[in-house]
């Protein structure tokens, strides 16, 4: 088989710019394009959530992909498929739709992240089975189905059970990438038992009355990856980053590989970015100040000269750092900064951040609606970006930030230490704190602010950050090698 004939289907619960809650969406927006440059044909499947605007993203119906039967144990549901090209590419992205499951705005959640457990369990089963049935109708047979996180973790088991003898699926291999080890898809077993044949439900990884989707995927995928070498070691050996996966991963005979993320340097390039106020580069930095001013207008908060603008962009949950930021707010504001918090998620954190912003309107701003255009403007207009995730497999925001001269201040986890060169005398591209406490965060940010007020040294730091190379090419070559190894070529 020649390299150009390899076909890979990527299956994910989120893809930017259609839906974004985490770095997974950014990965999906750019990595398949990088793989195509390595001689692979890539396509994507994801759910068609109610939040996705058909007109904005030019989705259209595919007549031959309408009324596809999705066989479940006690019933047969129907799905329809819409398609568009991933922006700035020719990669076909298929959106699986059923009004009952996806018309509501909510994304996939589990026992730890949401309340509608029955509805979410039915949704995830329908989606995973629907992906395979859509492939049959489409008649496009991938060599590899690359599943991402727990949302797609049922597919490897389905291929080993009910689809095992289906001629279409013979020879297809599966890869599962763990982006978020702490989001595992813990869902009630009784719904799986009701909707899936016994040979599937009986093989699910089960604890008490719940199924663990991520565990099930880990047990059945042909190859496992995560998004940095250090995080691969962390989830194998450390209790907190591993989130209970250590034992099951240790039993998978060395099939886990860590590959550091890259970014799409065509989409994330301040000299060509159409989503920012004014483009800039290392030899014409005035545009960064224009973006700072535009960001000030966007969040309705005047930015004072000499006061750094610090951003926090995250999903509001404990693992992404919401609790650490909440505990640090008073000390952060005492540093004499403008603080922008952008994200959504747990309503208790959203309320806490909103109350604090309302109490400090000249110093703190909260944005819970963060479309792609705002994300680009924020990255371009900020002076510093705080990344407080307790568990960070790799992350991509820090790479976006450095490319735009926005200096990261991040907790030392996973790919953070593989992508940020820690500031030292005459070198480095960002700041890293190593104790997960408010004092450690505030102390490191205070150090960064001290350098900010030394304009000559700060500009040298900004130049070093902006000239880092975060392109996907190296990671794409590693993945291409793993794919070929998996296919025995």
From Swiss-Prot:
Detail which positions bind ADP-alpha-D-glucose: 20
Under the heading Gene3D superfamilies, the entry gives: Glycogen Phosphorylase B
For this UniProt record, the keywords arranged alphabetically read as follows:
Glycogen biosynthesis, Glycosyltransferase, Transferase
For this protein, what is any one GO molecular function term?
A: alpha-1,4-glucan glucosyltransferase (ADP-glucose donor) activity
Please tell me whether the keyword Glycosyltransferase is annotated for this protein. Answer: yes
Q: Which EC numbers characterise this protein's activity in its record?
A: 2.4.1.21
Q: Which domain of life is it from?
A: Bacteria
- Write out the function statement from the record: Synthesizes alpha-1,4-glucan chains using ADP-glucose.
The name on file for this protein is Glycogen synthase
The organism is Chlorobium luteolum (strain DSM 273 / BCRC 81028 / 2530) (Pelodictyon luteolum)
